[in-house]
């Protein structure tokens, strides 16, 4: 039996190895070469052995130094193209997006855990257009977002109160965990109408979204289910699905009772809930596309996976940079004190008048993008920069590399928010996060850009400004002691994952600014 299996695998490996590299199907592209590629391409694994760094973006940077800003690899049997400059980003994500690169690459984990209905991942088409329009017009429109502003303010003040208690007791605070609680509770209340505690499950979902199995890339292994990958997917699904089922059922009961009261909202009951809007559409027989329960579940997972971990991780990176760069922290504090004053707490509406705080957010996303490697799938072959890009190829955009490339950023390894405020009238000050400046794409670009970019950046800026206004953060070392002087810095080591979090939790003892903290308990 083992001999037969070994022979079978050897034959498969030889078949994959000897199978020719796909060439362009259309006559107009047949004369074009594929992007440069390392030699040799190994049987079975292709070029996977070249990804020898713990973090994918670092391996891709090393390869780009040898093969240029546009090169091709084989992840097992899957053709893969790596893109590493803003100029090429624009060709892929703007010039040719509509025809060739409007679809994202999905793994089995993404398909299963989003019920194969993720608006972030489903192929471009009528359903995607319909759901995207629903999200932008009915869930994330200005009126709805503004109605939920008090809720977001409450969640930020919860964080500040926890920090104030830590400051009073001098007990070290795991800031990493508090930030995850903040984003989980905020998204949960906006989406579901209650603070459902699912951050551990959401974290596991994001973790496996950022992982790959050999079965994703070596097609003969798909039926074999090698390793624990599929089992982990099933385990996470079996934990997550009952929670969503329970919340939807509970929400339907609340809606039923509300109808019996002729739509009257009870005292203390949240009036604006995203899930209500989705259930309204599901019950509307006149809708052009009928929304199913599975599609609603997929959207719930979308909001949690996109809004919980990524915002918490980015905010933690920002706080870490502020701890390590006291000059930036002092300048930010002076701005907050000048604009907001010391008689009230920062409000989300203040962010528009805090340009340096907004620049800190941009600088954080430049150095620590939520998605360091953005993925698309080529759905129609095309020509890019004199090369043929084959249909079905996985496209990897190394956003992390561009954010630290000295060709596009002055002193790129320095955390310097001023770069977004300098040279008034030209240059960096015009760079925003909306996907039109291809040297800064933390939320993607084009049709597949994250729809919640404004909500995420406003929340992050408000929390940062609030913490800056109220506290200093004293770093706690491994032994639980507060670090002083040059030792009072935090590690900026990255960890593997879809959003590339810090490798170590941020643990601090907050130090209250006496003028601000009492207001936390009187508001």
Curated annotation (Swiss-Prot):
One of its GO terms (molecular function) is heme binding. Keywords: Endoplasmic reticulum, Heme, Iron, Membrane, Metal-binding, Microsome, Monooxygenase, NADP, Oxidoreductase, Transmembrane, Transmembrane helix. InterPro entries: Cyt_P450 (IPR001128), Cyt_P450_CS (IPR017972), Cyt_P450_E_grp-I (IPR002401), Cyt_P450_sf (IPR036396). PROSITE patterns: CYTOCHROME_P450. The keyword Nucleus does not apply. CDD domains: CYP93. The chain crosses the membrane at residues 2-22. Its main location: membrane. It is found in: Microsome membrane. Its EC number is 1.14.14.87. One of its GO terms (biological process) is isoflavonoid biosynthetic process. Heme binds at residue 450. One of its GO terms (cellular component) is intracellular membrane-bounded organelle. It catalyses: (2S)-liquiritigenin + reduced [NADPH--hemoprotein reductase] + O2 = (2R,3S)-2,4',7-trihydroxyisoflavanone + oxidized [NADPH--hemoprotein reductase] + H2O + H(+); (2S)-naringenin + reduced [NADPH--hemoprotein reductase] + O2 = 2-hydroxy-2,3-dihydrogenistein + oxidized [NADPH--hemoprotein reductase] + H2O + H(+). Its cofactor is heme. It is an enzyme of class 1 (oxidoreductase). The keyword Methyltransferase does not apply. It is a single-pass membrane protein. Belongs to the cytochrome P450 family. 2-hydroxyisoflavanone synthase, which catalyzes the hydroxylation associated with 1,2-aryl migration of flavanones. Converts liquiritigenin and naringenin into highly unstable precursors of the isoflavones daidzein and genistein. PANTHER family: 3,9-DIHYDROXYPTEROCARPAN 6A-MONOOXYGENASE (PTHR47944:SF17), CYTOCHROME P450 98A9 (PTHR47944). This is 2-hydroxyisoflavanone synthase. It comes from Glycyrrhiza uralensis. The lineage of its organism: Eukaryota, Viridiplantae, Streptophyta, Embryophyta, Tracheophyta. The gene is CYP93C2.
């Amino acid at each position: 039996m083992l001999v037969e299996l070994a022979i079978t695998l050897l034959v498969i490996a030889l078949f994959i190895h000897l199978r020719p590299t796909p060439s362009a199907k259309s006559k107009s592209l047949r004369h074009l070469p594929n992007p440069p590629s390392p030699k040799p391409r190994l049987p079975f694994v292709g070029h996977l052995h070249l990804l020898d760094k713990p973090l994918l973006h670092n391996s891709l940077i090393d390869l780009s130094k040898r093969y240029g800003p546009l090169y091709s690899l084989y992840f097992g049997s899957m053709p893969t193209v790596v893109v590493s400059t803003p100029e090429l980003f624009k060709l892929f994500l703007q010039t040719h997006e509509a025809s060739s690169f409007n679809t994202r690459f999905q793994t089995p984990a993404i398909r299963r855990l989003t019920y194969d209905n993720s608006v972030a991942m489903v192929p471009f088409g009528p359903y995607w257009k319909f759901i995207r329009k629903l999200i932008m017009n009915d869930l994330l429109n200005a009126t709805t977002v503004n109605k939920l502003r008090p809720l977001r303010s409450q969640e930020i003040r919860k964080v500040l109160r926890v920090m104030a208690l830590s400051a009073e007791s001098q007990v070290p605070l795991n800031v990493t965990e508090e930030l995850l609680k903040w984003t989980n509770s905020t998204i949960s209340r906006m989406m579901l109408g209650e603070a459902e505690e699912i951050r551990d499950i959401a974290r596991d979902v994001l973790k496996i979204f950022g992982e790959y199995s050999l079965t994703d890339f070596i097609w003969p292994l798909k039926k074999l289910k090698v390793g624990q990958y599929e089992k982990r997917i099933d385990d996470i699904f079996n934990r997550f699905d009952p929670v969503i089922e329970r919340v939807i059922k509970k929400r339907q009961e609340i809606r039923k009772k509300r109808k019996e009261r002729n739509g009257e909202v009870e005292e203390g009951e949240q009036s604006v809930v995203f899930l209500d809007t989705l259930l309204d559409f599901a019950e509307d027989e006149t809708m052009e596309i009928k929304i199913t329960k599975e599609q609603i579940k997929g959207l719930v997972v979308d909001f949690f996976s996109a809004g919980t971990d990524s915002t918490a991780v980015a905010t933690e990176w920002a706080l870490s940079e502020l701890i390590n760069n006291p000059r930036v922290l002092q300048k930010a504090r002076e701005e907050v004190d000048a604009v907001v004053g010391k008689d009230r707490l920062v409000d989300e509406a203040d962010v528009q008048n805090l340009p340096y705080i907004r620049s800190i957010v941009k600088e954080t996303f430049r150095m620590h993008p939520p998605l360091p490697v953005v993925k698309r799938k080529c759905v129609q072959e095309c020509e890019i920069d004199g090369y043929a890009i084959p249909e079905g190829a996985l496209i990897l955009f190394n956003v992390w590399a561009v954010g630290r490339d000295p060709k596009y950023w002055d002193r790129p390894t320095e955390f310097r928010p001023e770069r977004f405020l300098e040279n008034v009238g030209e240059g960096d000050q015009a760079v925003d996060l909306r996907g039109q400046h291809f040297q800064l794409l933390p939320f993607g670009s084009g049709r597949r850009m994250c729809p919640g970019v404004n909500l995420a950046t406003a929340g992050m800026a408000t929390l940062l400004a609030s913490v800056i206004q109220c506290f200093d953060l004293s770093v706690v070392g491994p032994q639980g002691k507060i670090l002083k002087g040059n030792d009072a810095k935090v590690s900026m080591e990255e960890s593997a994952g879809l959003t590339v979090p810090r490798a170590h939790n941020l643990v601090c003892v907050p130090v209250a600014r006496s003028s601000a903290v009492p207001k936390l308990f009187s508001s």
